[in-house]
Amino acid sequence: MKTATAVLLGLATATATTCDIYDAAGTPCVAAHSLTRSLYASYSGRLYQIKRSSDKATLNINTTPGGVADTSAQDFFCAQTTCTVEIIYDQSSRQNHLTTAPPGGAHNKSDAGVAASKAKTTMHRQPVYGAYFEGGMGYRIDNSNGVAVGDEAESMYMVAGGRHYNGGCCFDYGNAETNNLDTGAGSMEAIYFGNSSGWGRAKGKGPWIMADLENGLWAGRERVGPGPSIDAEYVTAMLKG
């Protein structure tokens, strides 16, 4: 059965129920990650966990009754200090929670979590925080449940900040190897956003949405041509594999 993964790290509407839409089409979400809101109309609970730098205490940030992240709890908890995001909870029933990534073939140190309060925006007049990624930051799950393997059909989508990007390798969200190693060309499927041009490029100077298929970024060809450079505050990216 085809499945979907969804991430929402930026702005969206609280009434959108992304994974309900996927489920109605027969492609249920097997992972649903968001720092800003619920991705199911019926979901209420944990969105992410933060850690306070002053004493290493942790706090789960839950949804409010409207489905938006309860950032007032975060602001109180992190007052007079700083916090990082340690866990991004999976809202689907699969429990595919993301934690900071372990060492791997491309990076021999564990990744750090993002600053919890750096990507501030609003949703329905409520302040929320996205995930502001910088070098050496990332999340992963290696013991995933129900995620496509091999050449099984899957799709994924991501909402990202359109003004924050770089040319490094590689800002992705998607389905990668579960051993943290490069196991060869074509061994992963993930959405890439940025202006890296070392393995592939689209039109203009970027940034672009491309597919990271391992050992290459795919901008499109033949039936689906390379896309344009993107100039927008927020970007919705989709990949069907």
Model-derived regions: residue spans:
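Fungal secretory targeting signals
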Residues: M1-A16
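Short tryptophan-centered beta-strand motifs in secreted/extracellular beta-sheet-rich domains
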Residues: G225, A232-G241
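GGW-centered surface loops in extracellular recognition modules
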Residues: T15-N108, G150, Y157
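Extracellular glycan-recognition modules
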Residues: V85, S93-D231
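Context-gated lysine
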Residues: K2, K51, K56, K109, ...
